[in-house]
């Protein structure tokens, strides 16, 4: 068994869509990023890669590469899952926390949970996602951006 932890944060400022956990969230601003800015999936990818000792998302999908400009993060997650399988790992379970002052995310968490559990090949009872605020403290509390943490347990396939 191996544990992986991932973190990502992006600031608001894009005129594009706000996508979190593969779900489009109605909001007047998107997140500034080289890809689609999905901090939830980026944190999850880092947790998966870290648990398997395969580096991080920046190593596999560098923001200096035109190939990943405006990339759909769900496709990046799929590529990470292929890498895990190639290296003999499967996901046992996962837990995520999104940290955002705005927008309110509770109505979208079930769709994110379903989307990500499916992408990881997990039943819903083995994947959790929740959201919190920073009670108006720091850059997130000032509504300057969104962050996410992910923890996963990986099993080595025999």
From Swiss-Prot:
<dbReference type="GO" id="GO:0008685">
    <property type="term" value="F:2-C-methyl-D-erythritol 2,4-cyclodiphosphate synthase activity"/>
</dbReference>
<keyword id="KW-0456">Lyase</keyword>
<dbReference type="InterPro" id="IPR020555">
    <property type="entry name" value="MECDP_synthase_CS"/>
</dbReference>
<protein>
    <recommendedName>
        <fullName>2-C-methyl-D-erythritol 2,4-cyclodiphosphate synthase</fullName>
        <ecNumber>4.6.1.12</ecNumber>
    </recommendedName>
</protein>
<comment type="pathway">
    <text>Isoprenoid biosynthesis; isopentenyl diphosphate biosynthesis via DXP pathway; isopentenyl diphosphate from 1-deoxy-D-xylulose 5-phosphate: step 4/6.</text>
</comment>
<feature type="binding site">
    <location>
        <begin position="34"/>
        <end position="35"/>
    </location>
    <ligand>
        <name>4-CDP-2-C-methyl-D-erythritol 2-phosphate</name>
    </ligand>
</feature>
<feature type="binding site">
    <location>
        <begin position="8"/>
        <end position="10"/>
    </location>
    <ligand>
        <name>4-CDP-2-C-methyl-D-erythritol 2-phosphate</name>
    </ligand>
</feature>
<dbReference type="InterPro" id="IPR036571">
    <property type="entry name" value="MECDP_synthase_sf"/>
</dbReference>
<keyword id="KW-0414">Isoprene biosynthesis</keyword>
<feature type="binding site">
    <location>
        <position position="142"/>
    </location>
    <ligand>
        <name>4-CDP-2-C-methyl-D-erythritol 2-phosphate</name>
    </ligand>
</feature>
<feature type="binding site">
    <location>
        <position position="10"/>
    </location>
    <ligand>
        <name>a divalent metal cation</name>
    </ligand>
</feature>
<dbReference type="GO" id="GO:0019288">
    <property type="term" value="P:isopentenyl diphosphate biosynthetic process, methylerythritol 4-phosphate pathway"/>
</dbReference>
<dbReference type="InterPro" id="IPR003526">
    <property type="entry name" value="MECDP_synthase"/>
</dbReference>
<keyword id="KW-0479">Metal-binding</keyword>
<dbReference type="GO" id="GO:0046872">
    <property type="term" value="F:metal ion binding"/>
</dbReference>
<dbReference type="Pfam" id="PF02542">
    <property type="entry name" value="YgbB"/>
</dbReference>
<feature type="binding site">
    <location>
        <begin position="56"/>
        <end position="58"/>
    </location>
    <ligand>
        <name>4-CDP-2-C-methyl-D-erythritol 2-phosphate</name>
    </ligand>
</feature>
<feature type="binding site">
    <location>
        <position position="8"/>
    </location>
    <ligand>
        <name>a divalent metal cation</name>
    </ligand>
</feature>
<comment type="subunit">
    <text>Homotrimer.</text>
</comment>
<comment type="similarity">
    <text>Belongs to the IspF family.</text>
</comment>
<feature type="binding site">
    <location>
        <begin position="132"/>
        <end position="135"/>
    </location>
    <ligand>
        <name>4-CDP-2-C-methyl-D-erythritol 2-phosphate</name>
    </ligand>
</feature>
<comment type="function">
    <text>Involved in the biosynthesis of isopentenyl diphosphate (IPP) and dimethylallyl diphosphate (DMAPP), two major building blocks of isoprenoid compounds. Catalyzes the conversion of 4-diphosphocytidyl-2-C-methyl-D-erythritol 2-phosphate (CDP-ME2P) to 2-C-methyl-D-erythritol 2,4-cyclodiphosphate (ME-CPP) with a corresponding release of cytidine 5-monophosphate (CMP).</text>
</comment>
<feature type="site" description="Transition state stabilizer">
    <location>
        <position position="34"/>
    </location>
</feature>
<dbReference type="GO" id="GO:0016114">
    <property type="term" value="P:terpenoid biosynthetic process"/>
</dbReference>
<feature type="site" description="Transition state stabilizer">
    <location>
        <position position="133"/>
    </location>
</feature>
<feature type="binding site">
    <location>
        <position position="42"/>
    </location>
    <ligand>
        <name>a divalent metal cation</name>
    </ligand>
</feature>
